[in-house]
Swiss-Prot record:
Protein name per Swiss-Prot or TrEMBL: Bifunctional 3'-phosphoadenosine 5'-phosphosulfate synthase pps-1
CDD domains referenced in this protein's UniProt entry, alphabetically: APSK, ATPS
Pfam hit, one: APS_kinase
Cell compartment(s), UniProt: Nucleus
GO cellular component, one term: nucleus
Organism classification: Eukaryota, Metazoa, Ecdysozoa, Nematoda, Chromadorea
GO biological process terms, semicolon-separated: 3'-phosphoadenosine 5'-phosphosulfate biosynthetic process; sulfate assimilation
NCBIfam families: apsK (TIGR00455), PRK03846.1 (NF003013)
Record-listed ATP 1 binding positions: 66-71, 218
Length: 654
């Protein structure tokens, strides 16, 4: 006979973001699972002191086992932390591992368990933190005592009834524990909701129906209540949290690598690995891995992520209720799909599996769990994503040549993705960039994406942008962010571009004091206005507020024609009204050309057109190949030497 499940522990079957650790307590319940928090100590520290005013309180979540208390409270904890509000989640199972490890399951011990938790929660709240307590706490008397402990010290106590029905909770009963099943079979005695009563709150401040509403909706209801009570700051900066998919615990990494030896594998292409890097570092927050069909359809048809539910349910069908617990406060722009194509043969080998090792060049980089395989429908995809299915478009060809199926699922990344090409020092994650900007005391960050060498016209635009930002900010910082993933064969290679950018900074054409050079890991798609939304949206993860959009961004020549495939002004126009990007200040690209009178790059002046010369990329490449130099003031001399050397080497090799 198993010991009784502690009535104050949480056994939610809603998805967790980290692998749980299992109890090794001797003489205590074996039904206690340690719940890992979803935010790090560093993230907690970043929230301290960001807002004035006291907002300490305890939010007490009560409900049946499996109702969703821990899932909601931890999602709320992450959201509050993102908003700069210090908070901490107390979970019933976690408390049983420490503070209350000496307590059993008699009525007296259960009362003492709640009393201790209430006293600890009061201290957290009294320190100015928002304490989130997730406990079944089935008895009204115990919850009233917890309230009195707070209110006797004039500390706010907010009771939240997670009112998920017993039927739904039993449906969620997670394997391998299957606590409800065991309780029904008489293997667990005193289990709340089965043979022990649950007394619903009579006057809870908030009631959540987590059987009907998603995690994000529940979190929003709690936030709305906090706002109505003046417990949220009036001005909240819109700086979304970053969702990294790296496994941070070395022991867990070792366990996953050992497990991978017995798992089916999928061999990644280099482009697949680049997309895995994008996901792992958090550029595609809130995605937890390669898209499932639901998110794929949202991206392809709406250009947005509307939710993080796992399955698509037809009208009238019952959903499986699986939903990622990452908080989504609003729809998120996601104009391009992030997917993992697989072949027919690979699909056959994955039938019925629940976990898959993702490898590149024989090395395990990630474990994909809860997989979903769905049809790629490549022709439909390229027509929607690129506006053409012409295989002469290099990225269209790449899609058409890929697998007929897409593999979606959550990924746990077991190692940092590096390419050992001498450029890894420039591959900064969003969180690393945020730390750099904080160290530089940036009060504004503006980004400039490019896949070409920098001439002085580009630099003029960046300097001019900073001058304008200085009217409202003290220290705006430039994120010079060249695209570092796959590009078409005739583009300048990444290593040459980085050397050229280094030379521009070394000559102080761009001031190193306010310029941060970093590589953006995304592959290029040449999808025009569709892709430029991704380029802007992904940089929000790094903490930018301003984005410079160029002429014909992510554009390409129409196959078989000298014309551009996409209308050259549409990228900027689309960004100005794209859904989910309203918090991002879009800075239009001012046209710069070579001013023959001033002998420098200047903004084009229509009143003296004859004084300006447009030095095209074709002309620039011709000058470099022939060993000629461009006009004075077109490009920093050492930067030109890098570029000329590259084109000269191409000519020699040919």
């Amino acid at each position: 006979m198993l010991t009784p499940r502690d009535e104050n522990n949480e056994g939610d079957a809603m998805p967790m973001l980290k692998k749980p650790r299992y109890s090794s307590l001797s003489g205590q319940s074996t039904n206690i699972t340690y719940q890992e928090h979803t935010i790090s100590r560093e993230e907690r520290a970043a929230a301290v002191g960001r807002h004035e005013g006291f907002r300490g309180c305890t939010i007490w979540f009560t409900g049946l086992s499996g109702a969703g208390k821990t899932t909601i409270s931890f999602a709320l904890e992450r959201t509050l932390n993102k908003l700069g509000i210090p908070c901490y989640g107390l979970d019933g199972d976690n408390i049983r591992h420490g503070l209350c490890k000496n307590l059993g399951f008699s009525k007296e011990d259960r009362q003492e368990n709640i009393r201790r938790v209430a006293e600890v929660a009061k201290l957290f709240a009294d320190s100015g933190m928002i304490c989130l307590a997730a406990f079944i706490s089935p008895f009204q008397e115990d919850r009233l005592d917890a309230r009195k402990i707070h209110e006797s010290e004039n500390v706010k106590f907010i009771e939240v009834h997670v009112s998920t029905t017993l039927e739904v909770c039993e449906q969620r009963d997670p394997k391998p524990s299957e606590l409800y099943k065991k309780a029904r079979a008489g293997q667990i005695l005193g289990f709340t909701g089965i043979d022990s009563a649950y007394e619903p709150p009579e006057n809870a401040e908030i009631i959540l129906d987590a059987g009907k509403d998603g995690v994000q909706q529940c979190v929003q209801k709690v936030l709305d209540h906090l706002e109505s009570k003046g417990l949220l700051p009036e001005q909240i900066p819109d700086v979304p949290a970053v969702r990294e998919l790296f496994v941070s615990d070395d022991l867990t990494v070792a366990e996953l690598l050992k497990e991978s030896q017995n798992l089916p594998t999928v061999e990644l292409t280099k482009v697949d690995l680049q997309w895995l890097q994008v996901l792992a570092e958090g550029w595609a927050t809130p995605l937890s891995g390669f898209m499932r069909e639901r998110q794929y359809l949202q991206s392809m048809h709406f250009g947005q992520l509307l939710d993080l539910k796992h399955k698509v349910a037809f009208v009238g069908e019952k959903s499986d209720d699986k939903e990622d617990s990452w908080p989504m406060m609003d729809d998120i722009n996601q104009s391009i799909p992030i997917v993992l194509p697989i072949s027919d043969d690979v699909k056959k080998g994955l039938e019925g599996v629940t976990r898959i090792a993702l490898k590149y060049n024989g090395q395990v980089y990630a474990i994909l769990s809860d997989p979903e395989i769905f049809e790629h429908r490549k022709d439909e995809r390229v027509c929607r994503q690129f506006g053409t299915n012409d295989p002469r478009h290099p990225a269209v060809a790449q899609v058409l040549e890929s697998g007929n199926w897409l593999l979606g699922g959550d990924v746990a990344v077991v190692q940092k993705i590096q390419f050992n090409d001498g450029l890894d020092k420039y591959r900064k994650t969003p969180n690393e960039l945020r730390a750099i900007f904080a160290e530089k005391n940036a009060d504004a960050v503006f980004a400039f994406q490019l896949r070409n060498p920098i001439h002085n016209g580009h630099a003029l635009l960046m300097r001019d942008t900073r001058e304008k930002l200085l009217a409202e900010h003290k220290n705006p910082i430039l994120l010079l962010h060249p695209l570092g993933g796959w590009t078409k064969d005739d583009d300048v290679p990444l290593d040459i571009r980085i050397k050229q950018h280094e030379a521009v900074i070394a000559e102080r054409v761009l001031d190193p004091e306010w310029t941060v050079l970093s590589i953006f890991p995304s592959p290029m798609m040449y999808a025009g206005p569709t892709e430029v939304q991704w380029h802007a949206r992904s940089r929000i993860a790094a903490g930018i507020q301003h984005y410079i959009v160029g002429r014909d961004p992510a554009g390409i020549q129409k196959p078989g024609s000298p014309d551009a495939l996409y209308e050259t002004t549409h990228g900027a126009k689309v960004l100005s009204m794209a859904p989910g990007l309203s918090a991002l200040h879009i800075l239009p690209f001012r046209v710069a050309a070579y001013d023959k009178t001033a002998k420098k790059m200047s903004f084009f002046d229509t009143s003296r057109k004859e004084d300006f010369e447009n030095i095209s990329g074709t002309k620039m490449r011709g000058l470099a190949r022939n060993g000629d130099t461009p006009p004075e003031g077109f490009m920093a001399p050492t930067a030109w030497e890098v570029l000329a050397g590259y084109y000269k080497s191409l000519q020699n090799s040919n």
